[in-house]
């Protein structure tokens, strides 16, 4: 079912989204289309992405996009997966691995709803949330999906398709 929802949402987005456009969501129901500027990293940034798992289509598709973007922009991306949800200790150990590797930022798809002592652990490394919100003031930015639209658009499509 997740795959179907993802595909339907992707189809909805195709009309507004292309390689040159971004959707900026203002709230659950309103977005504007913004042109994106093609970028190339001036140096090989070292980014470390932590995912709860790579066992389902959602995180696999996110990882595919991240890998493609890293390749396209000339960024060195290290990916670690925690083996499932509720794996705080695993992800804390992975942050240490990222720091030893020389990561310049952490892209955190948290496996838990809170991440105690995140500030102490990452020190000055920027943290960008991937999908799962922590609501931690340390987090610099968040990349996610509009959850309302993820359900609404496939439902809307199915209603229209059934007529």
Regions found by a protein language model. Name each.
Residues 113-149, 160:
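Flexible loop/hinge segments that line or gate small-molecule binding clefts
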Residues 47, 72-73, 141-163:
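Bacterial carbohydrate/catabolite-sensing allosteric modules
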Residues 1-4:
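Positively charged n-region of N-terminal signal peptides that target proteins for export
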Residues 88-103:
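Short, well-structured alpha-helical segments in soluble
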Residues 16-18:
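Boundary at the C-terminal end of the N-terminal hydrophobic targeting segment
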Residues 25-36, 46-65, 69, 78-89, ...:
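Extracytoplasmic "Venus flytrap"
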Residues 49, 99-110, 128-130:
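Periplasmic-binding protein-like
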